[in-house]
């Protein structure tokens, strides 16, 4: 889902960019590091990197060891200590983070409504929660 939204955005608002095919990290930092090193080596004109799943520590390690930290636009997913540090030191540009407490609350409310006796509450509902966006400047 993360990747399809990313690609959709670029199709609509930045069609001049060439998006590479995604590579799987299998949620492993070592694999992400190797894949990032390969991308940096094979695509010298790379202007950005979007890490939408696991392995962010490996991708960040590859950026730092290659000297590319701070030279690419790097977007990651979920604010946690490693991504916070990467924002602060300039290795990452942006972190998209789901509002986990609000997401959990909405899920529990939905489950309660689904098992309640109120027929209106049993109707399918959709709750849209805005994602939180973090940059170095708003931490």
Protein language model annotation of sequence segments:
Residues 21-82:
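Hydrophobic alpha-helical
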Residues 80-88, 92:
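Flexible loop/hinge segments that line or gate small-molecule binding clefts
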Residues 14-17, 69, 89-90, 128:
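Short, well-ordered coil/turn elements that cap or connect secondary structure elements
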Residues 1-16, 31, 35, 58, ...:
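Short, solvent-exposed amphipathic alpha-helices that sit
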Residues 99-139:
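Hinge/cleft segment of the Venus flytrap/periplasmic-binding protein
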Residues 89-101:
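Short beta-strand elements at the ligand-binding edges of bilobed clamshell
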């Amino acid at each position: 889902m993360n990747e399809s939204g990313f690609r959709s955005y670029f199709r609509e608002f930045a069609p001049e960019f060439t998006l590479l095919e995604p590579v799987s990290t299998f949620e492993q930092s070592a694999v992400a590091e190797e894949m990032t090193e390969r991308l940096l080596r094979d695509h010298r004109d790379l202007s950005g990197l979007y890490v939408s799943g696991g392995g962010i520590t490996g991708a960040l390690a590859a950026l730092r060891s290659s000297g590319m930290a701070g030279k690419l636009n790097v977007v990651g997913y979920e604010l946690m200590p490693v991504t916070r540090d990467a924002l602060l030191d300039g290795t990452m540009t942006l972190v998209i983070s789901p509002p986990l407490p609000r997401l959990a609350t909405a899920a529990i409310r939905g489950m309660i409504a689904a098992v309640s006796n109120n027929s209106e509450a049993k109707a399918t509902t959709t709750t849209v929660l805005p994602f939180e966006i973090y940059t170095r400047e708003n931490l």
